[in-house]
Regions:
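Bacterial N-terminal signal peptides that target proteins for export
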Residues: 1-10
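Intrinsic-disorder-associated interaction segments
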Residues: 6, 36, 40, 55-65, ...
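Gly/Pro-enriched, hydrophobic low-complexity segments
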Residues: 92-94, 128-132, 139-141, 145-300
């Protein structure tokens, strides 16, 4: 989860140090044995095998991607305090691919003045569709309501009912596999970094990792740069067949990502596991405490 796509840095250089001969002042080790002459030393060097210096290992395909992700996360943590957007998403949960969800989202990122948290993470979601959950609202403010979600039911019946829910409960995970506590752009990149680190550990030689970059992509009319990672073969520790992320070239935030599982057979299309698209993104909208007040759930 760009200003420019980074290229892999130069690989480490290995230097082979040889030993030379001194040709003057060399004493015979035994009586009657002459010191080697310059000519004999040169001949000895010429007879040595011509062993080339070992080639440095090639960098892992994900090395520059990780570096890039760290730099982007640092940039967002320094410059983005809050944002609003609309999310269009669907996920495969318990084997079934959801219908598209359309969600308006208000997010206040966590900020620090070391070591104190000056602004806790806060999230408000309002579901626009599909109809069975239209009008649902979900509120989370770290440190309030015992760190539980406040949820207005929405939908066709008893839409006004508000309950509090554990964000790690199974009922929440049946709706979304992305924790609401990790929904901010910085947290999306943090989750991406952890996944990349796991990929490197599972494929340390990088022979099962293909990285593609598209610098001229467009998402909803906005110029983007896209990164796609593919693992052709299923392997322990790898979580996906392919995953893509698009970064808005002007805003430097991820505006789309999708993940695919491995196909069951080579002639099948890989099954979609999840996709998220962010539109109408406004950064630093100066969201205040009233935006994340519980009273928002009781309104129309």
């Amino acid at each position: 989860m760009f200003r420019r796509w980074l290229r892999p840095g130069a690989a480490f250089l290995l230097t082979l140090l040889g030993t030379g001969f001194r040709h003057q002042g060399v004493q015979a080790q035994h009586a009657g044995t002459a010191a080697p002459t310059l000519a004999s030393a040169t001949l000895t060097e010429a007879l040595r095998p011509n062993v080339a210096a070992p080639r440095p290992p090639a960098p892992h395909p994900l090395e520059w991607v990780l570096k890039f992700a760290y730099e982007e996360q640092t940039y967002l943590q320094r410059t983005v305090r809050d944002f609003t957007c609309r999310v269009t998403k669907r996920e495969r949960i318990e084997g079934e691919l959801q219908d598209y969800r359309y969600i308006d989202m208000w997010v206040r990122e966590q900020t620090h003045a070391n070591p104190r948290v000056t602004q806790p993470p806060s999230v408000l979601l309002e579901f626009l569709g599909p109809s069975e959950i239209e009008g649902r609202k979900v509120l989370f403010v770290a440190g309030q309501n015992d760190d539980r979600l406040l949820v207005r039911k929405g939908g066709r019946r008893f839409s006004y009912v508000v309950t509090d829910v554990d964000p790690a409960s199974s009922i929440v995970k049946r709706e979304s596999l992305m924790p609401i506590t990790e929904i901010g752009f910085s947290q999306v990149l943090d989750r991406t970094i952890r996944t990349l680190q796991q990929d490197v550990a599972a494929d340390p030689r990088g022979d099962n990792t293909i990285v593609e970059q598209i610098t001229t992509a467009t998402i909803n009319g906005r110029p983007c740069q896209m990164l796609r990672i593919t693992h052709p073969r299923r392997r322990d520790g790898l979580q996906f067949f392919s995953a893509s992320m698009a970064i808005d070239s002007a805003l430097h935030v991820p505006v789309r990502f999708d993940v695919y599982d491995w196909p069951e057979t080579p002639d099948q299309q890989p099954p979609l596991m999840s996709e998220f698209t962010y539109t109408n993104v406004t950064l630093n909208a100066e969201l205040d405490d009233a935006t994340f007040a519980a009273a928002r759930l009781r309104g129309p």
